[in-house]
Every structure is written in C-alpha cells, then in structure tokens.
C-alpha cells in the first residue's frame, strides 16, 4: 500500500505535464514496485490516472490554458479573465478526472479493493511473484529490464537517484513557470548527460557507459514505434472526419436537460476513438458552448459551466484509456507493462468513473 500511495502522490505532484508525469512516475517507481510485488498493470494504471486527470484540474497547466483559449469569444466569455473564471467554476463539475484521481487513492490505500482483470493481475504478482503475465510484451526492451548493476562499484543513492530526480523536476517546473511550458525533453536530456558524467566519476569505464546508452535507446524503440503508429491513426481519423461525424450524429438528441451528459458521452467516444483529447476539445468546445449559451440567453449559468466541464472530462476519458493515446502509451512504457494488458486492466476503472460522471 505504501508504494502505491507514494506513486499516487508523486503523480499528483508532477501535475504540470501529462506526458512527463506517467513516464517519470513509472520509471522512478518501477524497481520499487517490483520488489513490493505490485503488478506492472497496477503501476501503469496509477501513473496514467495521475497524468491527464490531474493536469486538466489545475489552472496553471497547458491543458487549462488551451481549454480557456477555446472559450474566449463565445457568449459572454470575452477576455482571458472571463475564461479563467469559467475554468475555476468548472473544476467541481469536472467529475470524471476528479473521480479518476480519487479512485486511484482509494485503491492504493486499500479502501476500495481491486476488481476485474486488475484483481487477477495483482493476485498473480503477490502469489506467484510475476509482475508481468506469462507471454506479456512489455513496452520497453528486455535488455533494460534484465540489466545488472556494474560490479565493483558501490551504489551512490544521491548521485544515481536523488540528484537526477531533483534535476528533472527542477528543470521541468522551472521552464514551466518561466517559459510557459515544461521542457520535459530538455530535462531528461540534461539529466542523461549528468548521469553519464556521474557514472564516469564513479569509476565506470566509458565503454560500459556507451553500452548502457545503446541498450537504453534500443529498449525505447518499441514505445517510439507504437507512438508513431498511434499518431498515424490519429491523423487518418482526422482526415476521414471521424470526430465531426460523431458530433453531427448526436446533434439531434441535444436538449437543455441532457445537454451536459450527451456532450460528455460524445466527447468520450470521440477521444477514445481518436486518442486525442486536445483534438476533441478543439472540435467539441466550439459546438458545446454556443449551444449552452443559446439556452441561457448568453448568460454564464451552471448549464454553460457544466457543458464546459463535460467537454474537458470527456476528452480526458479518451486520453486516459484509449490505446491510441500518447499518455496511455507512456504509462505502459514507464512502468514496463504490456500495453494491451495496461489498457484492459485500466478500462473497468475508467468506465466506472465515466458512468459515475455521466450520472
């Protein structure tokens, strides 16, 4: 329970980037969770559920800025301050991400017991010591998993763990607050350079360092390939007009009484099918908000706020559980989980939160 709670808190703390968070949490907690006999599916679920669901609730993230920019100019939302006020009012009504984050904490603490495929995965890990199922294909190369520590060198926790983690968080947070976006790629790059120099200082031969770099690059190829394929499918879906078709098909069912719920379902389906939450926002928000304002005579009422939250929550649902989503792929990569196993074990939890949010 303690390891799972640490992973949960760590994911919430790294709120500023939905891409950085699952990769960071999975990588940092991977070996620790293995020793605690926590399945890879469980770790990837925790990492994934504290990524996009957290980012969309915090008003100082790229997600918030993007959602607010889509609202400016619609109805009585004239300025950025108006959009920010709308976003803040929508947080308590953004049920899906709230439920998703809370459910992780309840499960990690043992208050809510695992169910569905996740229960079987956890039972396998605890009773058989298998954090991966037999025949699973983890989204990182086996070379990285099976890599052994260099013999003859005493491990230095400060240089090999504490400093790199602090560097990544400091650079990512620093660039987020100073430049407006978290430079996660640069954070990892500079940390890798530091790690290479640190290994040399500790007496590890240059040849061994370069072999380690090669193994790391090789192990990342499966994840990069899957991401490229996911982006290709997303682009194809956009070209075919899948999202627009879904919206037009549901337009006849929209009435004030069910408007937020229908918008939420449409956004969920669209985001899951395309794997793109931001693409869903871009298509749904310009339709949902004008519809809501049409029923309120241009006034910012609870209906408008609820529709804004429905688009945000529905988009996060797709980003959270679609196998095409980059954050879902990165969660599998960071935890070293089989991607399909991660999706299958997480889906019942996501659907539970989705049904509760719909109700």
Predicted features, each with a name:
Residues 54-143, 309-359:
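Juxtamembrane and boundary regions of transmembrane helices in multi-pass small-molecule transporters
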Residues 100-177, 188-212, 334, 341-344:
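Long, contiguous bundles of hydrophobic transmembrane helices that form the permeation core
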Residues 75-80, 113, 172-182, 201-207, ...:
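Transmembrane helix-loop junctions in multi-pass membrane proteins
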Residues 56-61, 97, 164, 168, ...:
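Hydrophobic alpha-helical transmembrane segments in multi-pass membrane proteins
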Residues 158, 180-201, 208-242, 257-269, ...:
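Core transmembrane alpha-helical segments of multi-pass membrane transporters/permeases
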Residues 2-80, 273-317, 327-343:
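Hydrophobic transmembrane alpha-helices that form the pore/transport pathway of multi-pass ion
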Residues 1-6, 36-43, 93-95, 158, ...:
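Membrane-interfacial loop-to-helix junctions in multi-pass transporters
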Residues 86-94, 152-156, 176-189, 249-255:
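Interfacial loop-to-helix junctions that mark the boundaries of transmembrane helices
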């Amino acid at each position: 329970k303690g390891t799972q709670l640490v992973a949960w808190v760590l994911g919430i703390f790294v709120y500023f980037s939905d891409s950085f968070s699952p990769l960071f949490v999975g990588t940092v907690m991977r070996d620790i969770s293995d020793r605690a006999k926590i399945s890879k599916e469980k770790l990837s679920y925790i990492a994934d559920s504290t990524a996009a669901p957290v980012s969309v609730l915090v008003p100082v993230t790229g997600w918030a800025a993007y959602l607010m920019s889509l609202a400016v100019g619609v109805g009585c939302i004239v300025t950025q301050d108006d959009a920010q006020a709308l976003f803040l009012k929508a947080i308590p009504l953004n049920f899906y991400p709230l439920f998703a984050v809370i459910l992780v904490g309840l499960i990690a603490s043992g208050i809510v017991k695992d169910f569905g495929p996740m229960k079987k995965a956890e039972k396998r890990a605890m009773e058989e010591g298998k954090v991966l199922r037999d025949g699973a294909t983890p989204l990182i190369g086996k070379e990285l998993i099976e890599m052994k520590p260099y013999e003859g060198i005493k491990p230095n926790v400060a240089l090999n763990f504490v400093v790199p983690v602090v560097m990544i968080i400091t650079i990512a947070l620093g660039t987020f607050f100073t430049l407006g976006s978290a430079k996660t790629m640069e954070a990892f790059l500079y940390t890798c350079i530091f790690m290479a120099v640190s290994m040399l200082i500790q007496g590890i031969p240059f040849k061994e360092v370069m072999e380690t770099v090669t193994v790391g690059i090789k192990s990342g190829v499966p994840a990069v390939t899957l991401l490229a394929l996911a982006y290709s499918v997303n682009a194809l879906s956009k070209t075919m007009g899948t999202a627009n078709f879904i919206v037009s098909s549901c337009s006849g069912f929209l009435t004030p009484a069910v408007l937020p719920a229908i918008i939420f379902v449409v956004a969920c389906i669209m985001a899951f099918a395309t794997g793109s939450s931001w693409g869903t926002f871009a298509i749904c928000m310009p339709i949902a908000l004008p519809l809501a304002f049409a029923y309120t005579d241009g006034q910012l009422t609870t209906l408008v706020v609820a529709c804004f939250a429905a688009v945000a929550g529905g988009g996060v649902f797709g980003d959270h559980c679609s196998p095409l989503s980059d954050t879902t792929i990165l969660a599998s990569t960071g935890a070293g989980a089989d991607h399909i196993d991660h999706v299958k074990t997480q889906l019942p939890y996501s659907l539970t939160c989705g049904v509760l949010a719909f109700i």
